[in-house]
C-alpha cells in the first residue's frame, strides 16, 4: 500500500515456460512435446539501451518485486499459454490447460491473499472446458478465466463454444 492506496496489478504474468511448469505438471505422455508454442520463449532481458531486468523464477521473487513496487494484489495470467488457441488437438490442449492451472494454483499458494491466478480452459471441447473451469475455481482456487480472443478459423461467438452440460 502506498499513501493509503491499495494497489492492484490487474494484468500480472507468470513465466510459464517448460522448466517451470510443463516438465512437472504435464502428463508423461505429452512431456516430449513441451516446446508446444513455436517461438514462445524469447529473450526479453535485452532492451535497445540495456537490460530490462529478470523475470521472477519463484513466487517469493515475484512477491519481493510486488513489494518493491508497492503492489498489494496481483491477478496473474499466463505468458506462453496465451497462445493456447494455437493448439489444434483437443486432448493435448486439455492436458496443457490442466497442467498450467495446477502450476498456477501451486504458484499462488505462496501468498493466496496477494496472488490470484487466472485459469485457461480447453475451448476445443466446450464440455471439458466447463469441467476444467469448475475444477480450477472450486478445487484449485483460481479466480477467473483467460479465453483466447482469436481462434484460428472460428468466430468466438459461434455456438460450438457452448458447453453441453
Q: Model-found features: residue ranges?
A:
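Helix-coil boundary/capping segments in enzymes
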Residues: 1-165
